[in-house]
């Protein structure tokens, strides 16, 4: 059956706080990234993704501090993205305890960054994040949080990123993000089938069946979700049990 499929909660961090409606009832502090990371670790998450959505560069050291703290207490792989512009940024995040670094806008502005970072640290720790929107018969890559069109075809871009050394693709449907209507399965499948590296499906999860669909119909290797876990509607463990009942191999 191949490798177990992964469930990855995603935490958006700004100014040292997790945002996007984290409402864990029993948390003393609903915005504390370390406490939330520990909670997901306890629930059996396979990995965690932290996206630093802080616009200003003066807060960069804050995310490094958070990653150091989380890495000291949580022993599942951590992917960190947001504001990675040069190889030095990759180095600092890996040194702080990140296992993988996600590159998004900078990969488009400077594709060589992906090649340089993969060359220095290995493809296994370089993730390229692609935000895509439906455009005609295909999908177009957007940057700056889905606000800026690039004119790039998402499938071709994913193939190019793989060829430059990306070890994983984090694929978000901007059409579905936040809708809770499920992944864009056609997009997920098209990219998953076009590349050999793992694809993480993101954007649109509203229930546990959506996670199953992402793997079975979308051919994704991993599924990422935020609000369904943050709001406490489902635990990661419930999600894994549901996927397992539907014939998907997961790490229980």
Swiss-Prot record:
Keywords linked to the UniProt accession: Amino-acid biosynthesis, Cytoplasm, Histidine biosynthesis, Lyase
One Pfam family here: His_biosynth
Pathway: Amino-acid biosynthesis; L-histidine biosynthesis; L-histidine from 5-phospho-alpha-D-ribose 1-diphosphate: step 5/9
Subcellular location(s) of the protein: Cytoplasm
Domain of life of the organism encoding this protein: Bacteria
Record-annotated active site: 12, 131
GO biological process entries: L-histidine biosynthetic process
Gene Ontology CC terms, in alphabetical order: cytoplasm
Catalytic activity: 5-[(5-phospho-1-deoxy-D-ribulos-1-ylimino)methylamino]-1-(5-phospho-beta-D-ribosyl)imidazole-4-carboxamide + L-glutamine = D-erythro-1-(imidazol-4-yl)glycerol 3-phosphate + 5-amino-1-(5-phospho-beta-D-ribosyl)imidazole-4-carboxamide + L-glutamate + H(+)
Keyword Lyase belongs to the record: yes
Main location: cytoplasm
EC number: 4.3.2.10
GO MF assignments: imidazoleglycerol-phosphate synthase activity; lyase activity
Task of the protein: IGPS catalyzes the conversion of PRFAR and glutamine to IGP, AICAR and glutamate. The HisF subunit catalyzes the cyclization activity that produces IGP and AICAR from PRFAR using the ammonia provided by the HisH subunit.
Quaternary context: Heterodimer of HisH and HisF.
Family classification: Belongs to the HisA/HisF family.
Protein name from the UniProt record: Imidazole glycerol phosphate synthase subunit HisF
Species this protein is from: Nitrosospira multiformis (strain ATCC 25196 / NCIMB 11849 / C 71)
């Amino acid at each position: 059956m191949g490798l177990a499929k992964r469930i990855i909660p995603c935490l958006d961090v700004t100014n040292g706080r997790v945002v996007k409606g984290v409402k864990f009832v029993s948390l003393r502090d609903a915005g504390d990234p370390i406490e939330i990371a520990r909670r997901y670790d306890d629930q059996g998450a396979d990995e965690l993704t932290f996206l630093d959505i802080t616009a200003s560069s003066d807060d960069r050291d804050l995310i490094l501090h958070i990653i150091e703290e989380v890495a000291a207490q949580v022993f599942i792989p951590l992917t960190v993205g947001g504001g990675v512009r040069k190889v030095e940024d990759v180095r600092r995040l890996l040194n702080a305890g990140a296992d993988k670094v996600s590159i998004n806008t900078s990969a488009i502005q400077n594709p060589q960054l992906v090649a340089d970072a993969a060359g220095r640290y290995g493809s296994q720790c370089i993730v390229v994040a692609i935000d895509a929107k439906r455009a005609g018969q295909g999908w177009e890559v957007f940057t700056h949080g889905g606000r800026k069109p690039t004119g790039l075809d998402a499938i071709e871009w994913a193939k190019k990123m793989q060829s430059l050394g990306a070890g994983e693709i984090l694929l978000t449907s901007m059409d579905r993000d936040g809708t809770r209507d499920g992944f864009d399965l056609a997009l997920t499948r098209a990219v998953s089938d076009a590349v050999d590296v793992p694809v993480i499906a993101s954007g649109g999860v509203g229930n546990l069946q959506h996670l199953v669909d992402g793997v079975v119909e979308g051919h994704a290797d991993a599924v990422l979700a935020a609000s369904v876990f943050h709001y406490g509607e489902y635990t990661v463990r419930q999600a894994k049990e549901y996927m397992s009942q539907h014939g998907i191999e997961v790490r229980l």
